[in-house]
Each structure stands twice: as C-alpha cells, then as structure tokens.
C-alpha cells in the first residue's frame, strides 16, 4: 500500500492543479452537455479530466485502481476486494460549471480499507485548494496563502449557519429542525466546496437531502476527520465506502463540531 507522507500528498496536489488547468481551458469555451442515465448533466470537461486523472494516477501508482464518477460501473464483485483505491470526481459541481458560477472543483481521494485517508479538493477559478491527510491535518490554500484548519466549536448564541445547494429546498431542511429554530442558509455550489466551508468554520453544517455519490463525500471525510468534524446519515451513522453494490449515498449532514449532540437538532423521520 502507498505510504502516507508529504511526498505523496504533493504528487496528488500537482495532479489536481494540472486537472484544474484543463477545467479552466474548457471553462473558457462553450462545452457540449449531455444527460446521464440518472438525468444529471455531464460535459466534455468531465470526461476529459476523468481520463486525464485516471491516466496520471495509474502511471504513478500502477497497482492502485481508480474509481471515477464518470467510470463507476465497475462491479462490486470486482471492487469489494480492493485494499486501497483512488476515488475521483473530475468535476464536482458540473451544473455550476455549466451555469458559470465558478463554484466547481476537482476532487481526488485515496481510500484505504474502506476509509478515506488523503484528499485534495481544488477549485481552479476560485484559486482555492483544501487538502488533508490522516494524522497530518487539514489545510486551505488561497492563492499563495496556506492556513492549517483547526477544531471548530458550534456557537448557539447566533443562528445555525447551514450550507445548502442552489436547488435544495430550504423548507425541506427546516422540516428536520425544531420548530422556529434560528438558522441562516448559505447557498454554495459543489458538495466538496461546502465541506471545505464546514471544515474551516465558515458554516456550522451542510445538509444534503438529495442524491450524491461516494466520490462527493469521501474527500470531506478526511477534511473533517482532521478538524474534529463528522458526517452522519439520517440514522446518525457514518457513511460507508465501497461496502455496498450501490455507490449512492443516503441523505447526510456534515458538521464542523462532532462533540455537540446533533441528535437534539436534527429530527429525521
């Protein structure tokens, strides 16, 4: 298995930056858009960067398989025995890319024994990169400024800050909160960028009551794990990785302060 160290992290960062440059080039022109079987959009940028990432990672780490959102039809029978693998989302926030909101990213995560252990989230237009590795910490790079992110404490002297997507029903989110619970919604693009905001304490949590894939959340597991945050499903159980036939996540909440009793806030049916 790969050794978790700064050299490995820097190799992955470089690949993420190279992928970001490709996304920038596609972003400057009109891209072809198609609908996938699940009715979500995919562009030529998704497909190109998926192939680029797969080739780069395979060339550097030939014994480590790659699972991409755009090539996720590998059978569970084949992948269930993987000891470690790369889980990638070449363009997290495809709809934001199409809508030209700048809020999209490339996401690379190393999963070992069903646990994400290294992650890089790079948003090229925002010049923002989040990266984390087990027992190393979580960092945010904005332009040339690098900051190590630390433990967050949820402050209930003010409204709860909840990150949601642009298409998320805020009333639906309110329905799982106590009646008249004070909160404010922060609308952000891709799932990975929302997880970065949770990790740095810009929001208290991110609620997702819609469909996502394991590639959308794996990176957040490392970011939040290193800053004492957490991700849980509607039963307050952790998400799983490569342990089921499906790669689709259940509904979930990401929180920046895992020490708080979130069961007293979120009231799932």
From Swiss-Prot:
Lineage top rank: taxon: Bacteria
Catalytically driven reaction(s): adenosine 3',5'-bisphosphate + H2O = AMP + phosphate
Subcellular location(s) of the protein: Cell inner membrane
GO molecular function: 3'(2'),5'-bisphosphate nucleotidase activity; magnesium ion binding
Residues engaged in binding Mg(2+) 2: 89, 92, 216
InterPro entries reported in the protein's UniProt record: CysQ, CysQ/Inositol_MonoPase, Inositol_monoP_metal-BS, Inositol_monophosphatase-like, Inositol_monophosphatase_CS
Biological processes, Gene Ontology terms: 3'-phosphoadenosine 5'-phosphosulfate metabolic process; phosphatidylinositol phosphate biosynthetic process; sulfate assimilation
Cofactors demanded by this protein: Mg(2+)
Membrane spanning stretches: none
Membrane topology value: Peripheral membrane protein
Binding site for Mg(2+) 1: 69, 89, 91
Enzyme class: hydrolase
UniProt xrefs under Pfam families: Inositol_P
Major localization class: membrane
CDD domains: CysQ
Keywords: Cell inner membrane, Cell membrane, Hydrolase, Magnesium, Membrane, Metal-binding
Keyword Oxidoreductase on entry: no
Biological role: Converts adenosine-3',5'-bisphosphate (PAP) to AMP.
Record-stated family: Belongs to the inositol monophosphatase superfamily. CysQ family.
Name of this protein: 3'(2'),5'-bisphosphate nucleotidase CysQ
Species the sequence originates in: Haemophilus influenzae (strain ATCC 51907 / DSM 11121 / KW20 / Rd)
Classification lineage: Bacteria, Pseudomonadati, Pseudomonadota, Gammaproteobacteria, Pasteurellales
